[in-house]
Amino acid sequence: MLEFLKGKLIEKNPAYVVIENNGIGYLVNISLQTFSFLKEADEAKLFTHLAFKIEATTPVGLVVYGFATVTERQLFRLLVSVSGVGNSTALLMLSALSPDRIISAIQNGELAVLQSVKGIGSKTAQRIIIDLQDKIGKEKVSTEFLGIAHNTRKDEALIALTTLGFNKANSEKALNRLLQKNPEFSVEQLIKEALRIL
């Protein structure tokens, strides 16, 4: 079992990073929370979750998910334990909402907050709350995640959205509208706002 990966950051995008360790480059899928946490780091230690990807169009493969903190990984694992919430949906939730906000929404039964995430309908939101309310209890999540903006914000946001499976043209239109509305949006803000309108 792979508990964590530590090494040099070869590539960094809002949706994934490539970490080199002992001459091997690992592609690790990340949330926006983790992307923000990495800042301008040259090296990183990410706590990992491994999953098998089984699709009709591609061969079976191992997918690595990485998280800046153990707490974020625990929340990811709790989310994927809920029927109807897969790895991509859980990662999308952690990108659209902070771990604190997700936990608060579950504890307080706030369906609307969970439903604000693309792909989470009423039934899935209810299932998340019912299945996880007792498991989460009074658990606190670290709020050490900080925002970051570098390179071309629009390009990075576009990469993240297309990696998450959204249409490139629609994503670009949404990002252009958002930047016209507020040119100061960070990459994370752009992606979060785009997730709400796509």
Please state what every model-predicted region is:
Residues M1-L5:
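Short coil-to-beta-strand transition motifs
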Residues G7-L9:
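Conserved hydrophobic positions within beta-strands
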Residues E11-V113, I128, D134, K138-V141:
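Long, highly charged, low-complexity intrinsically disordered interaction regions
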Residues A90, I102, A125, S171-A174, ...:
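Small-residue helix-packing motif on alpha-helices
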Residues Q115, G119-S122:
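Amphipathic, coiled-coil-like alpha-helical scaffolding segments used for oligomerization/assembly
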Residues I128-N176:
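Strongly charged, low-complexity linkers/loops
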Residues V187-L198:
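Amphipathic alpha-helical interaction/assembly segments
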